[in-house]
Amino acid sequence: MLWFLLFAIIYLYSLLKEQHYILIYYTYWSLTLEIVYFGLLLSGRPTKWLYSIILAPSIVICLGFWLVIAPMYPWSSPSVNIILTLVTHGCNMVALLTQKQERIYVREVWKPLLFTSIYQFFLILYVGSGGRSSSGQLPYWYAQYDRPVGWVFALLATFANFIVHIGVASYMYTDQPAVKQPHVI
């Protein structure tokens, strides 16, 4: 319940701050599904199908943010909220990795790839039609689809999800049968 409440509060705060612009970010697409996932856990409903979609993106978002975006991020800006940043680019990954009752399989790699590809297609259409963030800037500095950098990062994000999903499915989850454990919330 703690993860669900934390993510829901952060989401509502972000929604008030960014308004309708919130869903131009891959982070919030993923966070939306993470809130649904933890909500389903709370209600005792099956979550396995959703877990296999969002685990790899949560890891890619965390690593991608801290390795690619954070070094260029205007941390001194008064609009930066470090708690919001830590929750949406780290805590969510930790929350999902601690869900030991869940398993993902290599054969499910298409799920995070489809999710990421749908987002990439949306972002290309959004930016291509002149869409910007609430500050009037591109949603991401690399979302320049009139230049090679935009396409390179789109492919890198998709490929990163492929590698992460295969890696996690291969190394964290062995071929041993899943052990029934209570849901950790």
Residue ranges and their predicted role:
Residues 20-28, 50, 74-87:
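Non-cytosolic membrane-interface motifs at loop->transmembrane helix junctions
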Residues 81-91, 152-156:
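Membrane-interface loop-to-helix entry segments
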Residues 127-172:
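Membrane-interface transmembrane-helix boundary segments in multi-pass integral membrane proteins
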